């Protein structure tokens, strides 16, 4: 069976060099994050570890123009590092954007496991990294997924996690859980990864929606994924984010990111259909309340056509958007 809802008690060895402790690298990138960055950094610096592994904290200053770095350096200088976290503050030669900065962080990480945390989010519990490490080692998994608490701007909180532990050892099922059921999230920061898995496909350097172009590929490369029924990351929907300010651009970016993966998964029709279903959720939401004169409307239809061609390559006819002055006319025509 592809997905199992039971625990396995088998203990296994991790992919470390004989005689050496494992190292978990946590990566945070920041840009104009002076308001929240200490919450994120402190939540990592408070993480406990064991004799089996150490924690390396790679913090990437993506040429932030505000006081984030000064605030961070003052905190690191005055705060006792009681847990002996190995802090590495690095800076690229130029601003790279979200995707490029994360890739830069990965390149500077020396751990054999990777975790990520955005500068405006934080880990809820002090033993999260420890439990994530133990889970990925004991299950001999490539990826372990955890849930999150989504803090909305209006103060409401939404918990997002599965009800019971799931073990997925089938690539197609994993992709369906990602695109259709949302049990596996597109975001990069609710997971722990084996570094050697991530090395097989470079993190996207896109400035936004880079995770949509990366996570599905990492999921497809994983032989075993574990999904845990616990919320471990506090996700803050903060105003001013380059992603959250424009819903239209956000959904278009998600759809475009999904479409960019169709070539990779073109030989698995079930995965393609799951991907298309996920994209259609965003398409439907975009169409609702937007007129056909919206600049993004034609782009949406072109993406829809592009995806359908992959799913039904032998039978699908080219469709283009065609609304004229008659509002009752069909918006589509066959060519």
Where are the regions that the model predicts?
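Membrane-interface aromatic/basic loop that binds lipid-linked glycans or pyrophosphate carriers
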Residues: 1-4, 8-18, 290-335
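Nucleotide-sugar donor-binding/catalytic module of glycosyltransferases
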Residues: 2, 9-255, 334
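Active-site activation/catalytic loop segments of kinase-like enzymes and analogous catalytic loops
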Residues: 60, 283-292
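Generic secondary-structure transition motif, activating predominantly at the C-termini of alpha-helices
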Residues: 76, 80, 137, 181-182, ...
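Short glycine/serine- and small hydrophobic-enriched flexible loop segments
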Residues: 220, 260-263, 285-288
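Catalytic core of nucleotide-sugar-dependent glycosyltransferases
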Residues: 232-238, 244-273, 293-313
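Long, charge-rich low-complexity segments
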Residues: 261-277, 323-335
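Amphipathic alpha-helical repeat scaffolds of TPR domains
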Residues: 274-286
């Amino acid at each position: 069976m592809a997905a199992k809802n039971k625990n396995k008690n088998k203990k296994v060895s991790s992919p470390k060099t004989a005689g050496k402790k494992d190292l978990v690298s946590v990566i945070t990138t920041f840009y104009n994050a002076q308001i929240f960055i200490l919450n994120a950094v402190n939540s990592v610096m408070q993480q406990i570890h064991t004799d089996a592994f150490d924690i390396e904290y790679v913090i990437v200053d993506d040429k932030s123009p505000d006081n984030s770095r000064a605030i961070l350096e003052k905190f690191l200088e005055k705060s006792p590092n009681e847990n002996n976290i190995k802090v590495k503050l690095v800076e690229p030669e130029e601003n790279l954007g979200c995707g490029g900065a994360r890739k830069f962080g990965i390149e500077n990480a020396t751990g054999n496991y990777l975790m990520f945390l955005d500068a405006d989010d934080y880990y809820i519990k002090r033993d999260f990294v420890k439990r994530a490490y133990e889970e990925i080692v004991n299950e001999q998994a490539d990826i372990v997924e955890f849930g999150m608490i989504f803090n909305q701007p209006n103060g409401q909180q939404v918990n997002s996690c599965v009800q019971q532990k799931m073990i997925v050892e089938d690539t197609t099922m994993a992709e369906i859980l990602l695109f259709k059921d949302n049990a596996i999230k597109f975001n990069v920061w609710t997971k722990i990864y084996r570094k050697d898995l991530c090395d097989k496909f470079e993190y996207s350097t896109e400035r936004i929606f880079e995770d949509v172009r990366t996570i599905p590929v990492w999921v497809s490369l994983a032989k075993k994924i574990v999904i845990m029924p616990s919320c471990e990351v506090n996700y803050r929907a903060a105003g001013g984010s380059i992603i959250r300010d424009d819903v239209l651009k956000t959904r278009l970016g998600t759809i475009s990111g999904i479409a960019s993966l169709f070539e990779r998964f073109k030989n698995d029709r079930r995965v393609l259909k799951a991907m298309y279903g996920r994209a259609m959720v965003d398409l439907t939401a975009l169409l609702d309340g937007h007129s056909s004169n919206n600049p993004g409307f034609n782009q949406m239809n072109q993406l829809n056509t592009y995806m359908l061609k992959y799913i039904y390559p032998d039978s699908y006819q080219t469709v283009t958007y065609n609304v004229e002055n008659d509002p009752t006319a069909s918006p589509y025509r066959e060519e």
